[in-house]
Amino acid sequence: MENERITKLRAAVKPYLTDKRYAHTLAVEQEAAALAGIYLPEKEEKLRIAALLHDITKKESTEKQLQMCAEFGIMVDEDAILAPKTFHAKTAAALAARDFAAYTDEEICRGIRYHTTGRADMTVFEAIVYLADYIEQTRTFADCVTLRQYFYSRIAKEGTANRDIILRDTMI
């Protein structure tokens, strides 16, 4: 049976996304659920939520992203200015915490926050959101396809006993 909260959230995020981005978001949700089955089955719903919210500010212009950063008190340093396509991770996490508070918690918001850049010592939850965004099935870039094949071929070959090593190796 479909989770009613997730069904409602899917509908709620749709206005924030272009049609293409919505399709990507649903694919990330499916990938996050698949990865949850391997790594964190008890957190599948939370991973689905993070996936559904991860790009809710992606369609905003750089100017709007900077306005949102100011509104939410997000520091924007020189390095960030050089990579404006990563702003949406910070602003989406902040917007999700405010506008989707009934769905989010700190772990979900951190997963959203680090889904583009990653970070040192990522949690398994954060790594799943990051990886799901990159290897979801609608991604056809050569690097995405190669990494998806690498990850799942290793899981198929080695099983889940080495899952932590496989995740770490995939994140490098």
Question: What residue spans do the PLM features occupy?
Answer:
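Short, Lys/Arg-rich amphipathic segments at extreme N-termini
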Residues: 2-34
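Divalent metal-dependent catalytic cores for phosphoryl transfer on phosphate-bearing substrates
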Residues: 8-15, 33-34, 38-167
